[in-house]
């Protein structure tokens, strides 16, 4: 039996998200890295007049905490040279978040702060652990940092948001915010949300964006047709929340490759609380690297390739000199 359209009641996503802070200290927005549509949604959210009154701190994955003093000065309005600012996102684990949307996020917060009274200005905390790429020469050097990523992020949230009684918007990749591990043989580790809820149960509301339904996308997406863009809908007690979570994980598999085995009965509702609809999968777009940056800076290009070689799966090629596909999912 196909789902009934009447069982879902999407609400305007921006006001819906802001209203969540009336009942939760934290809203965790899972980010699809490079998504232009999600970045545009975040920009519109930041500009909503009710947002600064509801939120005091934003914690982002796409920033190296080594540069937190630089970011604090920049967000406060101080002039920072581009060469000093760009390492914030470029020196992230891996080869950096150098797509334009990440720099634009920080500049948007800075611009909004200029319009706000001092007491209402937003603070941005850089969620990745502080580390210096010049000290990383082999893959094993990254192991200790990898183990600290979720711990560092969660510790920031506990210290700077929960302890003083503030409200915070958390932005990071989906894996950091999954409420339960999906694999039947999941390791005894804890991601960011699991760490937070262990000590602060009920403090986090998790939102995952729509990226399709794997092999069932063409069958299920028509049931979302007509929704306003952007929309937010609860996953609790709805057919959407009861969908097999494998349909979500299947979105990341190469053609012909089956998604990993999951726990029996594991659903979208086990992973998150709400679902953010930004349009059908085929309409979603990507913020792409600018090849001209790397063609004109051989040292930067070589360094990013070096970092990539230390963290990427075998056979994965980083091509920074060719303009990328503007579609988020080219399939």
What are these regions (language model features)?
Residues 1-331:
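Compositional signal for N-terminal targeting/processing segments
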């Amino acid at each position: 039996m196909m789902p009934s359209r009447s069982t879902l009641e999407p609400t305007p996503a921006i006001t819906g998200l802001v209203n969540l802070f009336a009942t939760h200290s934290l809203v965790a927005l899972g980010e699809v890295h490079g998504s232009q549509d999600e970045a545009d949604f975040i920009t519109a959210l930041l500009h909503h007049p009710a947002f600064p009154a509801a939120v005091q701190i934003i914690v982002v994955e796409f920033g190296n905490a080594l540069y937190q003093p630089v970011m604090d000065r920049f967000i406060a309005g101080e002039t920072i040279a581009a060469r000093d600012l760009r390492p914030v996102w470029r020196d992230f684990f891996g080869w950096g978040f150098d797509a334009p949307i990440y720099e634009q996020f920080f500049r948007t917060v800075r611009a909004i702060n200029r319009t706000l009274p001092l007491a209402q200005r937003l603070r941005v905390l850089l969620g990745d652990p502080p580390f210096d790429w010049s000290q990383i020469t082999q893959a094993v050097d990254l192991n200790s940092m990898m183990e600290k990523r979720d711990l560092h992020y969660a510790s920031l949230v506990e210290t700077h948001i929960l302890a003083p009684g503030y409200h915070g918007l958390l932005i990071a990749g989906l894996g950091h915010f999954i409420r339960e591990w999906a694999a039947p043989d999941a390791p005894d580790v804890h991601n960011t949300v699991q760490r937070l809820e262990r000590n602060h149960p009920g403090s986090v509301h998790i939102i995952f964006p729509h990226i399709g339904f794997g092999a069932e996308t063409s069958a299920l997406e028509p049931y979302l047709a007509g929704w306003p863009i952007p929309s937010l809908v609860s996953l609790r007690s709805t057919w959407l929340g009861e969908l097999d979570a494998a349909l979500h994980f299947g979105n990341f598999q190469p053609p012909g490759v089956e998604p990993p085995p999951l726990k029996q009965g594991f659903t979208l509702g086990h992973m998150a609380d709400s679902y953010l609809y930004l349009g059908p999968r085929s309409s979603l777009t990507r913020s792409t690297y600018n090849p001209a940056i790397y063609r004109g800076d051989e040292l930067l290009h070589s360094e990013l390739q070096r970092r990539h070689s230390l963290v990427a799966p075998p056979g994965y090629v980083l091509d920074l000199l060719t303009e990328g596909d503007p579609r988020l999912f080219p399939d």
